[in-house]
Structure formats: structure tokens, C-alpha cells
UniProtKB/Swiss-Prot annotation:
Species, as recorded: Clostridium botulinum (strain Langeland / NCTC 10281 / Type F)
Gene Ontology MF terms: magnesium ion binding; phosphoglucosamine mutase activity; phosphomannomutase activity
Name the UniProt record assigns to this protein: Phosphoglucosamine mutase
InterPro entries reported for this sequence: A-D-PHexomutase_a/b/a-I, A-D-PHexomutase_a/b/a-I/II/III, A-D-PHexomutase_a/b/a-II, A-D-PHexomutase_a/b/a-III, A-D-PHexomutase_C, A-D-PHexomutase_C_sf, A-D-PHexomutase_CS, Alpha-D-phosphohexomutase_SF
Family per record: Belongs to the phosphohexose mutase family.
GO biological process per UniProt: carbohydrate metabolic process; peptidoglycan biosynthetic process; UDP-N-acetylglucosamine biosynthetic process
Organism placement in taxonomy: Bacteria, Bacillati, Bacillota, Clostridia, Eubacteriales
Length: 449
């Protein structure tokens, strides 16, 4: 059995790879490992709007109850809400059934510990080992020792909306905002929060039917929102993904504003408020070099991690940083939540736009994005480190780096799932870096033939 858990829980095509049987086993093993020694543990269960959510929830909950835990089912709710509410309700763990930005046929199961953090690799391995060993040494409970399912009546959504609203001071009166809910988990929470803060709210893709989640909508397909913002003279647009742990924005001219710009704007604002701990933002190696240049001008440090919000969070926790995130719109505000939170991000951004008195596009001028080229080089899995070993490749990388002279960079990343290395170049001249990236990718491919 290979590793069951990926970077974001267990994911696969629902009813084919992620079966009801597997969901039952994950519920049983997860509840047993995460609540060992607790008399009558409570586990919070939420999901996004996918049609397969009901099937997987039934199976997952059966597994949880079989080891004597209580399952508190809160229904459709954003992933970051489960992270927050697990702490607020003093639950022993939280689980979300969602495949985030993936198409409808996929689903996933992701656990949070009692503090609202994603699980460590070690805990995930313990859950997998228990399943692999067919629940050896797990007692079979009967009678009154079996757990109960508790259907929650909407209080969880109310508590999460109140929490999200509390992260900004004042209201959003006078701001005209367009929201794209991706027909996903934010279709109630984000709309209500913005309305209650007195923004003028326009909404698209907020009618989930179980199969339209992420379909030509949300943060992965923001084209309709870009058009809508301009057509309706909105001050800004905000696009969520299926489980609302990420948010991208649209300025009043219809331009897509990615996570790098959001980090730059929010980082500068936190510094102004004296809340940017150690004067640092945490980004990944894939963040645009333009972000580093912009932050340097603001006398803000950038620290880089591997790609993945879990690595960003690790770095933030280790050194007590206030903000970090990815280009994709996973932004973590450690003062507020333990994971990327689309609604919290959207509210911070909207509040900054309102308070600044500037247009959103003016605020975005803080940063100039450098052209970026990404080329895949086909490389056998056992030779993915060739760029570190081969002298000619190393020499070519050094030459390119020298010629870019601080206003560009070379980044090579082996794919974790395919026989590829990704060659990424950034620089001021699109044509030049395009040629260099393709040349370097070709050199790498030729060396493994």
C-alpha cells in the first residue's frame, strides 16, 4: 500500500478511488487515533456541495461512531470554518469532506486536530497503519458504548460568519463587491458576511446543485467574474474555490489579482498597523520575484518555503509570523485562523480598499509582476536530480542566473507525481526568458536520453 494521504488529506474519484468503504475506515481509524484516551470524544464533520458528500459523510460518520466517538454534523460549510469551530467547540478533531478546487467527480477527506491544524505526517501514517493492519487491537464496542450522530441546526454557520466579521473593524458601507462562490461551500457564509457588513453585494455562482461546484466558476475560472465586475461597475470582485479556503480578487478594471498581490497589499497594511511580526511575510518558491522586489521597497522581508500551504504554515508557526500564503490565493492570517481562509482574506482586502480611499487597481500598483515561463522537461523518476549533478546543466543555470543579474531567476522543481522536472524562469524580457527556459529544458531532456 502506497501512502494514502497526499498534501491535503486523502483524495480521489468518489465511489471509485475514494469509496464508502474507505471513508468508513478513515472515520474509524481517524477517530481512534485522534481521540485515544478521551471518554466520549466529539468530532466535527463538515463538507462542500458535491453530490458524493452525502454518501461519504454517511460512511465516515459510521466509522467515527463505531469507536465510540460522537459525530457533530454541521453540513455544508467552508473548510476554514471547521478548523476554527473545532477549537471554538472544544472538539477532539474536525473532518472535512471536500476536494477543494478539483472537479465534481473528485472528493477528499481531510482531518484537523483539536487545535484546528492539519495533521502531521506521523499522525496520518498512524491512521494508515491502523487501516493496513485491519484495526488490530481496536476494541469492538457494543451497546451504550457506540457513539451518536448529532445533527447541528445552523449555529455553526452563524458562529463562523460572526468570527469572520470580527476580523475587521467597522463596516464595508459604500463598497460595491461582486462575489463568485464557485457553487461551493461559501455560498451562504461569504454572502451573509458581506451583507451584514453593509457592502452592496452582487453574487454569481451561488446556486449549488451537487454537480456544478467549480464548473467554469470560482478562483480556478474567474473569467465570468472579471467580466461581471466591469459590466456592473463594482469596486472589486472576490472569487472563492469549492471549499473556500482560498480567494483570488478582481480589480475594478477586470484584472485578475493573485495571491502575490494580496500578500503584498495585506503585508503592507499589517506593517502600517504595527502587526507584521518580525516584519516578514512567508511565501513559496513559486511566488513571483516581483513580490520580493515590492516588499524590499517597503522594507519587508520575504521568507520562502516549498510549494504547499502546509509548508507555509509550518514556517509561520516555527517563527511566529503573522501572514503567509501562495499565488493560488491560500492566505493564512495566523492571528485569526490555523489554515487558509477565503472569507477572512476577502474581508481584509475589502476593508483595506474601503479605508484607503483608493481604487483597488491603485493599491495593486505596489507590485509589478515579472514575466514568468514554465516549461516541463520529461525526465525518468530515478533521474529527477540530474540538474544537481550534471556539470553542463549546472554551468548553464549559473550562466543564466548571472545574465539575469538580480532582475530574474531560475527555479527547477521535480514533479512529485509525474516523470517531469519543471523549469521556471522569471525576468524582465518575456521573449528572452521563454527562449532560455525552453533551451534549458531541452538540455535536461537530452542528458537523460
Amino acid at each position: 500500500m502506497g501512502r494514502m494521504f497526499g498534501t491535503d488529506g486523502v483524495r480521489g474519484v468518489a465511489n471509485k478511488e475514494l469509496t464508502a468503504d474507505l471513508a468508513y475506515k478513515l472515520g474509524k481509524a481517524g477517530a481512534f487515533i485522534l481521540t485515544e484516551g478521551t471518554h466520549r470524544p466529539k468530532i466535527l464533520v463538515g463538507m462542500d456541495t458535491r453530490i458524493s458528500g452525502d454518501m461519504l459523510e454517511s460512511a465516515l460518520v459510521a466509522g467515527i461512531l463505531s469507536v465510540g466517538a460522537e459525530a457533530i454534523c454541521v453540513g455544508v460549510i467552508p473548510t476554514p470554518a471547521i478548523a476554527y469551530l473545532t477549537r471554538k467547540y472544544n472538539a477532539d478533531a474536525g473532518v472535512v469532506i471536500s476536494a477543494s478546487h478539483n472537479p465534481v467527480e473528485y472528493n477528499g477527506i481531510k482531518f484537523f486536530n483539536k487545535n484546528g491544524y492539519k495533521l502531521s505526517d506521523e499522525l496520518e501514517d498512524s491512521i494508515q497503519a491502523l487501516i493496513r493492519d485491519d484495526f488490530k487491537d481496536v476494541p469492538v464496542l457494543t451497546g451504550e458504548n457506540i457513539g451518536r450522530k448529532i445533527e447541528e441546526d445552523g449555529e455553526a454557520i452563524r458562529d463562523y460568519i460572526d468570527f469572520a466579521k470580527s476580523t475587521i473593524k467597522g463596516d464595508l458601507k459604500g463598497l460595491k463587491v461582486a462575489l463568485d462562490c464557485a457553487n461551493g461551500a461559501s455560498y451562504i457564509t461569504s454572502v451573509e458576511a458581506f451583507k451584514e457588513l453593509e457592502a452592496e453585494v452582487h453574487v454569481i455562482n451561488n446556486k449549488p446543485d451537487g454537480i456544478n461546484i467549480n464548473r467554469n466558476s470560482g478562483s480556478t475560472h474567474p473569467e465570468d467574474l472579471m467580466e461581471y465586475v466591469v459590466k456592473n461597475n463594482c469596486h472589486m470582485g472576490l472569487a472563492f474555490d469549492g471549499d473556500a479556503d482560498r480567494c483570488l480578487a478582481i480589480d475594478e478594471k477586470g484584472n485578475l489579482i493573485n495571491g502575490d498581490f494580496i500578500l503584498a497589499i495585506c503585508g503592507k497594511e499589517l506593517k502600517k498597523q504595527g502587526r507584521l511580526k518580525k516584519n516578514t511575510i512567508v511565501v513559496t518558491v513559486m511566488s513571483n520575484l516581483g513580490l520580493d522586489i515590492a516588499m524590499k521597497k517597503e522594507e519587508i522581508n520575504t521568507i520562502k518555503t516549498k510549494v504547499g500551504d502546509r509548508y507555509v504554515l509550518e514556517e509561520m508557526l516555527k517563527n511566529d509570523y503573522a501572514i503567509g500564503g501562495e499565488q493560488s490565493g491560500h492566505i493564512i492570517f495566523s492571528d485569526y485562523n490555523t489554515t487558509g481562509d477565503g472569507l477572512v482574506t476577502a474581508l481584509q482586502l475589502a476593508h483595506i480598499v474601503k479605508e484607503s480611499g483608493k481604487t483597488f487597481s491603485e493599491l495593486c500598483s505596489i507590485m509589478k509582476e515579472l514575466p514568468q515561463v514554465l516549461v516541463n522537461a520529461k525526465v525518468p523518476n530515478d533521474q529527477k536530480d540530474i540538474y544537481l549533478k550534471d556539470e553542463e546543466i549546472k554551468s548553464e543555470i549559473d550562466t543564466i542566473t548571472k545574465n539575469l543579474d538580480g532582475s530574474g531567476r531560475v527555479l527547477i522543481r521535480p514533479s512529485g507525481t509525474e516523470p517531469l522536472v519543471r523549469v521556471m524562469l522569471e525576468g524582465e524580457n518575456q521573449k528572452e526568458i521563454d527562449k532560455l527556459a525552453h533551451g534549458l529544458a531541452k538540455l535536461i531532456e537530452n542528458k537523460v536520453k
